[in-house]
Amino acid sequence: MGGLLLAAFLALVSVPRAQAVWLGRLDPEQLLGPWYVLAVASREKGFAMEKDMKNVVGVVVTLTPENNLRTLSSQHGLGGCDQSVMDLIKRNSGWVFENPSIGVLELWVLATNFRDYAIIFTQLEFGDEPFNTVELYSLTETASQEAMGLFTKWSRSLGFLSQ
């Protein structure tokens, strides 16, 4: 199927915003289509225990008639396949999306080469507890050395455990 999209930088002080800004202006069409989610990292409490029970398959990114991003994601786990649809509204800054009504505070594209990978940071909020992830999206079933290196760099600099 495909991989997910973008990432957020709200309460993280350890990574300067300037590192994510070099991407320039966003053309949402550069993110459209199927993506494999090849790696996920987080420092959320339950992540280390749950990571062996989940296998993220991918995401398909499309545009809505309102020009927002829509993601159809598929995740395999012990209970079978779960699918979800999420609409993300573009903020004024080029690579930031949100949908606070469903708990997505920010989604940022941290890095991409516009050809085969994107590193996505997501800040979610469930109740009053924030939950952050970094994900490696790839247009192919295996990631390039460049993509893996950037994913590892971002994950480690944020102190995340990877899956």
UniProtKB/Swiss-Prot annotation:
GO MF term set: small molecule binding
Record keywords: Fertilization, Secreted, Signal
Iron found in the keyword field: no
Tissue specificity: Predominantly expressed in epididymis.
Gene3D superfamilies: 2.40.128.20
Residues in the signal sequence: 1-20
GO CC annotation: extracellular region
UniProt entry tagged with the keyword Secreted: yes
Regions annotated as coiled coil: none
Subcellular location: Secreted
Stored SUPFAM superfamilies: Lipocalins
InterPro entries, alphabetized: Calycin, Lipocalin, Lipocalin_CS, Lipocln_cytosolic_FA-bd_dom
GO biological process: acrosome reaction; calcium ion homeostasis; cell maturation; cellular homeostasis; response to calcium ion
Family from the record: Belongs to the calycin superfamily. Lipocalin family.
Function statement: May play a role in male fertility.
The protein's name in its UniProt record: Epididymal-specific lipocalin-6
Organism: Homo sapiens
Taxonomic placement: Eukaryota, Metazoa, Chordata, Craniata, Vertebrata
Gene encoding the protein: LCN6
